[in-house]
Amino acid sequence: MEKERIIKLSELPQGTNCIVKNVNGDAAIRLRLMELGFVENEPVMVIKNAPLMDPVEYQVMDSHISLRRNEAEKIDVLVTDDTPESPLNVINKKIDFESFELRTCPDTEKCCNEKNAGKKTINVALVGNPNCGKTSLFNHATGLREKVGNYSGVTVDAKVGTFNFNGYSIRLVDLPGTYSLTDCSAEEKYVFYFLSNCKPDVILNIVDASNIERNLLLTTQLLDMGIPVVVALNMYDELVSRGDSIDYKTLGSLLSLPVVPTKASSGMGIPELLKTIVDVKESDEQHLLHLDTSGLNVEEATAYRYRFIRELLNKVYKSGDKAKHRKAYNADKILTNKWFGFPILLIFMWLMFEATFTIGSYPQEWIEMATEWFGALVGSWLNDGIFRDLIVDGVIAGVGGVLVFLPNILILYLFIAILEDTGYMARAAFIMDKLMSKVGLHGKSFIPFVIGFGCSVPAIMSARMLENRKDRIVTILTVPFMSCSARLPVYLLFVSVFFDKYQGLILLGIYLVGILFAVITSLILNKVSFKGVSKEFVLELPPYRIPTVRNVLIHMWDKSVQYLKKMATIILAASVIIWALEYFPRSNGDDMLTDNNIEYSYIGKFGHAIEPIMRPCGFDWRLGVALITGIAAKEVVVSTLGVLLDAEDEDVSLKEKIRSIDGFTPHTAFGFMVFVLLCTPCIAALAAIRREAGLKWAVFSAVYSTALAWIVSCLIFQIGNLIL
């Protein structure tokens, strides 16, 4: 006989199957859980606990969702001895498809008039769930290279691309991923506002074919907007490969909209999709249908829509082998294992830094030799004088000192691309949530932190994925303590000079110091400014995917172009300005650049003025000036040293000149790297903080981090002197 009992979802052990009976809690969390699939009569399976036993991974509607135990406690479930049926076969009340109240959109005439007004331009809004392949499709269609990744929250604002197709100019707007059009998050509000006010000609709804039931919830809401909808059934190859099948033509007929199967990562189906958009634009009739949910509250409407979707899929969808469904998550048996999860994460991080230094050192040496050779060659062509000094000591020494670290930065971005594209980024957040919540940080904050290893600006912007303002602000203010790639040239330079035997470990140590002070800052902010409770940890764990070589190479190429552009603009300008400030004023007839001249130059006088502040940290005036110029961009620290130390002997490498600085010891060098790590973010990052959090927090970040950098570096130097 079947045994049944009602229990809290949080109380179930791993491997238990159950059926949702009720969702409790406040309205916002109830709605979010329902949108993710936790609706009445929906089967759920408890997959596993995180290594620290919280959060917990659940399978619902062919997706894997991470919930903290206090969130899972809000869900009442029915446990049976039998494995629940497929959700497509579990419907609490059998209904006929025709019983759903579908009607023609009252705004059809208005939409058609707006459509005809801009005959040669089609405005298309790209809408879909997070991580459904929107941005990949956007890149293939437009030829642009926006960031893609296998985790939710990659797109944080609207991206626009325009291209020509069949005589039309198609303006494609990639909107942030959203589970619905309610107002549970900033992304949902943004998407709803855009669709309501900008009125695109066509909504291109990207539906993840491998998780179609949940994705169609958004589709039913888009049908209510009064705008023609075209559905791209993306990742169609994954659906087929696991033995599932769907009659997408019948699906389109029942929804009164065109459905086109696609594979955005390779471009499959995109030409047909664009042709369908043009056909919709040229069509004289637009039969826009939607569900009549009048008289229902938001939660009732969500449940009603899922009933409609279940009945719809019963007509067109056939599920294959469930073992193939689980195949995409098999790696979790090891990567998020109770015993192996943390060690594997730490090993990966160490490997990233070790490879960045070890592998990158070979091309770095080649570029360094080429730069020195080129500088000597140009110097031999030019006559002694101001112009020669500008080119050799200013431009080549300054820009060349930064150029040599390009291979290391590309290797770092290679590892970050692998983290993002495989889906491991979300697993890292899953593993770290319990630990991070103890120090006042949200588990999702780990994603901006890892992005921050590349650049603080997109990392700060990605904090928008956090729904709670407190979590968002704390994350934004702690992200700059992650060592971005702009700081990497400084670390690599000093590590190679003073820590040759332990390069990988010292580099990892610097990154860990940044994480440590991010934690300390979070604790301070939570104690002083933010005393509220963090938002719930609701995170989708995407299936593992093998990164495409194309996406990884594009990611690395784009970063190299950005780096080279920065060298051709900010770093070049800074190098020339620093050279001019060190070159002038000059006495009559004195055209030689010597250490004595630099002492009395404009920059020398400025450096000596701030030297009393820097001396307690063990830094002379040249190091102090380099730190100040690093506010423009952290790479400028290296180019500044390249200019300031290139005085009399052009044949000696920058590393040798740094090693020869009086009193500059390994612990002083470590303190200098920590100062670069902790001091005020660059101008671009401060602007991002101001835009995302406000002027007050941008000023706080600059002042607090600079004071912290001085105190910590001073302690390292003074304690080091006592011990060594």
Give, region by region, the residue ranges found by the protein language model.
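Hydrophobic core segments of alpha-helical transmembrane domains in multi-pass membrane transport
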Residues: 344-354, 412-417, 495-497, 511-524, ...
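Juxtamembrane inter-helical linkers in multi-pass membrane proteins
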Residues: 369, 373-377, 381, 426-456, ...
